[in-house]
């Protein structure tokens, strides 16, 4: 018989999941005076690819920004690689792709310079060795931007900016890759390139947490979906399947205005 919570000495916290790369427990967070996360539990284990889904304003981006420390928790616990957040220092193990931003943040830079910035945490005193340069080149190749390495990022399209941001995260050879809306506003060709790059990471055992609006070409890679609604987890399991008219090509999303008390519309992804 599995041990029950009552078997633990009174007052002892639950044991940590030793396979967890990310572990949020009872996490709450606010943006200004507005509560956004309302006591969510989220565990991402070694080697998993987890999609974080939900309507706009459900708390998806706030959740991932809490994981990397950009939004502080107001209550609850966070551990990374088994280490409580306040003691975690090994940020080189984490690659992060932010939501909807330009590759250089308005600073003049070449594609290679931006991607190289993602490698600096792995270097000594910021000096690139041969292995570092090889990692940068490999990251550029993975996203199909090696031939644009010397170009200014100001000359790139939106989809190419997104490729560069992903290459920057990959250049550090992370153990955990967190991507916030990596497919947003990206053309189909770029989506396929990014899916291919992600497949390579999954094959080498990288743990991945994705915020998505549409599964698209990433669907075969997803192990688990966690759906948020109003800052609460309402689903944690296999990705919802498309049904009815929503399964038709070109309708790979969910309308978030369904009655909250009704069975959620299940499509390619709950957005």
Predicted regions: what they are:
Residues 218-220:
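A short, surface-exposed alpha-helical micro-motif characterized by mixed small hydrophobic
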